């Protein structure tokens, strides 16, 4: 499986937060690149893990809180409040401070190297001139998008109220009043709110009996999901494929996410409240309910109808500001919804002493809200006893207070139920705030308002923070969600709980939990509860000797039962095993804190004594006892211990190595540490299990034998088995997150790299397995192709041969031939399909014998097809001839007396008999087929045609006699001859007579004879040529006079409409378009040219197949190499023309005008002629240099063989024939004519292209490899002006390089160019017009001293236009290509901890400028006047140094760069670049926004530095 790139992870995260992503992508991706470059030093993986994922959790919380009160409504902007369509509200990078005005501000997620990213408000400082950053507390996320929040900000500002929020968009920065921003828009329909569900559920769901699961809930109605529900994120399946980069969960320190999102944490929660229950303001939204397992499918994530949250206010027992959760609603989730917790919430571990408020203990020693407090020893003892009771394994818990016993009954009822959280993350622990940068935690908030007050200034989601050295007290039974989830309330249930709950994402998965979760009971000897309660703490500090410091604080009152000696030994050995090898050698320094005079566990001192005496080296190297009074009796006889006071701690360890309680700076969280290391234990077991299965799969693949039977190509079964392993899925999903969380522990610097190394071994093993699987699949494909080849060969020699032989005698009738043709088409299609399969197999493994068999069968197939087509043509001719004769005789027999001559003339004119040439051609065709029946039929057709001609001649002769003339006059007088009048021309049939010497007549175009009244007037003018001096003759037919020049309507004949209808068409005598005869003549000429072209191509292929004489001995080694290169190019031309091009031309025989498209389709192959031109000119120059040495004429010296001159002569023939064909094509066939013109241009370019390639090789003194600079676009001489210098230079324009050279004398008969200067086109800018001559343009370059610029004067306007157009197109193409480079660089390398991305330097990346639509920090490059648009110019920039346009249409970057041609372009009248014949107009100019928009080659595209960067950066030779 391919790894999921980091880019996909980034895009999916942004798409989930800022929909629609296609609108917000330009702005967001630019901000992403900016932060990656400036803050994370181009490490995309670190950016993703350290910034983007925590920021997603934070922003998801903000969005959910903002949308909470609008649950059930359909938002008009689905990304509100983070974005409004393309306008981004919460920025991921800083905006230019110059855009800020008084009263403006914007929101940004600010990265931090020392802690998780945070939300901040940025505005102008009161004095102006700088930006002020106001942190937004995590607690404020609950009411961020409210007017009260901004009012609170404005209260603390001395001057100037903030009122307008800045939004970033592709078009620029937008301003929106905060009052409008915080009010979302909804979609309405017919006066009702779309998506509102007024009748499906009551406002408050009735709660069931305590301890029972909630009743099943109906599904949501379509459209009721809001952005805060988490449904706008793409659904991701939990079962990832191999090394699929899934989202990692990082510890968001201080985040309140899971405090409200985790059900069953505690009975009383401290959460911020907005409005009181008295109804003064808006209420909280309907709460979402979690589903119980077993009530439905595991993927029931859509049925979450709104339900009311807490229906009661704060309980009397809870502290002020806390909301009491009713007992019947213990499974209720406050914030965020179930799926949102599963996707976006970070870890929130609960530490002992961080949750205030017990079940019924009242406030106890707690002081007034908001005042710092210090709890006495008694409360501390109560706290620790309650904490241990909550964490005890096996059900032993501390006695509960009377107020808690009632809740315990509900817990017992719920203890055996499945977990109420089906979709939440395992990190459901409450966590304290971490305050980086200060020496100690901040004090508690000044004020926590009650539920009835208006709004809190600062609230705590995970428990309040307090002042003092570790004075974090718990006033009731504390909870440690150490194993991934706990019971709904109170202490943990007796059932062992897994350390990490399976994350249910999307629609759930079918992974068994028992296969993924490792329960605590799997490690019965490691006392996790002792470490979680703070009894044993590996602080992460070291003493003065460098030993790891371990603190032991005995609980007060002591645990019941106390820990045994073996338990303590095992736990201490486990903590010692976590250290690095060097620290393990030094041993542990154990600090026993007895300042509170707690009773010591009986087994503690013997265990320490044993560990101090045993082992090599001993595990405990130093024992320190911290005490206020005298030593306890248990320690009086203990040897090797040092007794210390609090003042002596400074000489033991530095303050930064000690805990807060000991006067130091460290503040470890035991519960957090235990949770992470339990997950590490699970991770190691997963790694070991996966590693075993992967290695087993590798052995199976390496030992797999080649199958005897054919198998389907696909993923090998061992790999499928590994990928289906739920352990691998869990490892993919959680492994990286666990390792990242392990690094966040205080003791991580002291611990070894065992888990990471094991994780890396799994990564490498999976990579090895994938490589073997890919090799296995390739072998399968090869075997399958070879089997197909064998099957094709067997079919060709068997059924194929039999069917081909059946077409040898196609039949003697037209119907039989047509039926045979249908069968042959089906057979030919099958053969071609099988031949394609066979050639695909031969491409993998060449086999000359098989290839020959295929070629022979294909040739025979073509011969049969040709014979069948000729037989069909012959039979169709016979049928048409018989039909013509039959219709002629029928006309003669059915006509009345005196009309036969007219009918005969019409028949001859309208459908003339086949000419003698056509008969001779058909006779040759019959002889070629070798069919006696066809020859007999040919003779019969000829005899019948001659008989009909004789009959027509006989009737025409009779009508031309005097008797016939008198009969016609009488008939005319009786039928209305008075209508003609005295001036009517006398009709004469002499014009109908055939010429005296009958020559060949044109072949019949069709076989039917049209009625005389319909067709005579159309063809009458061309019946017979008039003699010189005679007036034009006319023929009278039913009231119409038809002369050779006009048609005059004499009557209202019923047939008139037929004439008029036909006259309007292209076949009418005055119809539009080319006349019929002219069109026939044009088609005939086209077919003649195509036939000549095919014959010429056949001769050319035969000539290329002839051997070339070997070169003479007088050739130098260099010339011999050129000779061999020319022969190689000639052989490639022979292969191309013989295999492909000849067949293409033969296929165009019936469609002559398709020849142009045929040439263009093989344009890449015709580029071989440019290479051939280069080699031939080198040979000619070299042979010319050798000729004086032969002391004779050229004939006596070496010469170029005729066989090597033939290819270029063929190019000339192609061009001549195509030009003639272009002249014969009619104007209405515009597309074919354009293709022919482009083909002619293609052929003409090859000669010039070859000379350009030769000139490139003639550049001397250049240390740059010009072959790596892309295609050579142009080469022309220019007058170059640089400052006061003016010189003549030959300039070469490559795709990546601009080179100046000077022409020197011939070297061996060829030109030579001396290298002068070179510049990268990525640093180049263009000004199209300089001066008034119209011949000059300017090229200038960034990163040069004083903006180095060169003015180039062309010899003609055409050359100038060609260069400027190509340079402009080149710069835009580089800009489009830069987008692809950016995407390709963000590629994941696996699931290991290796870096996934190497992004270019800051100076080489400016795609963010394009995506954000802002100027690229004065990276001015090119001002192209051909892209001018109306609009004001950008301020502060000169026309020669403009910055990027304010906006670039996104469509301009979604281009297929391969379609952009490098051919010269022209400018149309509008000033836009119009492509040449071969160009594809796929690249658009920039969006209107400035008078001279710019093209920034370097500013748009950051190319990687080539090996010759130094040669390009500094001039080596003066220009």
Curated annotation (Swiss-Prot):
Q: Where is the composition biased (Pro residues)?
A: 200-218
Which InterPro entries does the entry link to?
A: DBL_dom_sf, DH_dom, PH-like_dom_sf, PH_domain, Rho_GEF_signaling-related, SOS1_NGEF_PH
Coiled coil segments of this chain: 828-871, 934-961
**Keywords, comma-separated and alphabetical:** Coiled coil, Cytoplasm, Guanine-nucleotide releasing factor, Phosphoprotein
A GO molecular-function annotation: guanyl-nucleotide exchange factor activity
PROSITE patterns linked: DH_2, PH_DOMAIN
| Comp. bias intervals (Gly residues) | 355-367
Which PANTHER family does the entry mention?
A: RHO GUANINE NUCLEOTIDE EXCHANGE FACTOR 40 (PTHR45845:SF5), RHO GUANINE NUCLEOTIDE EXCHANGE FACTOR-RELATED (PTHR45845)
- Protein's recorded name: Rho guanine nucleotide exchange factor 40
**Origin species:** Homo sapiens
The lineage is:
Eukaryota, Metazoa, Chordata, Craniata, Vertebrata
